[in-house]
UniProtKB/Swiss-Prot annotation:
Gene Ontology terms: cellular component: cytosolic large ribosomal subunit
Organism of this sequence: Mycobacteroides abscessus (strain ATCC 19977 / DSM 44196 / CCUG 20993 / CIP 104536 / JCM 13569 / NCTC 13031 / TMC 1543 / L948) (Mycobacterium abscessus)
Gene name tied to this protein: rplO
Biased composition (Basic and acidic residues): 15-28
PROSITE patterns reported for this sequence: RIBOSOMAL_L15
Listed GO MF terms: rRNA binding; structural constituent of ribosome
Function per UniProt: Binds to the 23S rRNA.
Database matches in Gene3D superfamilies: 3.100.10.10
GO biological process, one term: translation
The protein's name in its UniProt record: Large ribosomal subunit protein uL15
HAMAP family linked to this entry: Ribosomal_uL15
């Protein structure tokens, strides 16, 4: 006889109903498996409680400062990256940088001045550092803040 899907049954004893405690003397009533007296019988002890020892969250130092919720994060592209990705020069837009895999789409882009630039490029980005501005204009290129 071949075994089919509708012949399968769970192993005997593997599917038992949850025991409801504290529902009568005959079925785990009264103390309901908690033993007699003491804190654990009367109420729950917090998971973080370490038995009176100074807890870990109080032993560790506090972190200084805060995280500014309104900070604008920029993806960084260096002048050296533009030189490497666009060796023939031309228009460098955010869409072109996304297509080349230099930045992720739908995020702000800032051009920084690390490296050298020898080709003439027209760069469009959200922000530029002062050194990047100098290097792009020195190479004969132009800057467009979007």
């Amino acid at each position: 006889m071949t075994i089919k899907l509708h012949h399968l049954r769970p192993a005997p004893g593997s599917k038992t109903e949850r025991t409801r405690v504290g529902r009568g003397e005959g079925s785990k009533g009264k103390t309901a498996g908690r033993g007699t007296k003491g804190t654990k019988a009367r109420k729950n002890v917090p998971v973080t409680f370490e038995g009176g020892q100074m807890p870990i969250h109080m032993r560790l130092p506090k972190l200084k400062g805060f995280k500014n919720r309104f900070r604008t994060e920029y993806q960084v592209v260096n002048v050296a990256d533009i030189e490497r990705l666009f060796p023939e020069g031309g228009d460098v837009t955010i869409e072109a940088l996304v297509a080349k895999g230099a930045v992720r789409k739908n995020e702000l882009v800032k051009v920084l001045g690390n490296g050298d630039l020898k080709v003439k490029v027209s760069v469009s980005a959200n922000k530029f550092s002062d050194s990047a501005r100098e290097k792009i204009t020195a190479a004969g290129g132009s800057i467009n803040e979007v």
